[in-house]
Amino acid sequence: MAEVLKLTILTPDREFYKGEVLEVITDSIQGNITILPGHMPLITTLKSTDTRIVEKSGKELKAFTSNGILEIKNNELKILCDVCEWPGEIDLKRAEEAKKRAEQRLAHKDGIDVKRAQLALNRALARINLLK
């Protein structure tokens, strides 16, 4: 079994993270998932969540990751998502306002895309939870 994973996190705007890690914990549509070195090959869909990264040095990092795709093969882990942010990049006030708007839309379902409003709520909650 290999000692480390090669992790790459990509968004349309940037290469968010690239490095050797011991562990990654995130949320897939099937539930919480922990990826360790030697993990079996897998492709899964990710939910908006706070993702925990344990670097080779043992340093723990947390980041907001939006819905996306995770692929693990040959100890190379790739996460592709629309948005990825470090805690210092998140505007708490903006996230709380987005949460409030999404909750209002869901309460008055007339003429809205419920799935889109629910995804917006999930993104806002994940950002808020990461900062608390």
Swiss-Prot record:
Subcellular localization: Cell membrane
Recorded topology in the membrane: Peripheral membrane protein
Domain of life assignment: Bacteria
InterPro entries: ATP_F1_dsu/esu_C_sf, ATP_synth_F1_dsu/esu, ATP_synth_F1_dsu/esu_N, ATP_synth_F1_esu_C, ATPsynth_dsu/esu_N
Disulfide bonds: none
Main localization of the protein described in the UniProt heading: membrane
GO terms under cellular component: plasma membrane; proton-transporting ATP synthase complex
Record key words, sorted: ATP synthesis, Cell membrane, CF(1), Hydrogen ion transport, Ion transport, Membrane, Transport
One Gene Ontology molecular-function label: ATP binding
Key word Signal present: no
Keyword Ribonucleoprotein in annotation: no
Subunit relationships: F-type ATPases have 2 components, CF(1) - the catalytic core - and CF(0) - the membrane proton channel. CF(1) has five subunits: alpha(3), beta(3), gamma(1), delta(1), epsilon(1). CF(0) has three main subunits: a, b and c.
Family note: Belongs to the ATPase epsilon chain family.
Function: Produces ATP from ADP in the presence of a proton gradient across the membrane.
Protein name as it appears in the record: ATP synthase epsilon chain
Organism of this sequence: Clostridium kluyveri (strain ATCC 8527 / DSM 555 / NBRC 12016 / NCIMB 10680 / K1)
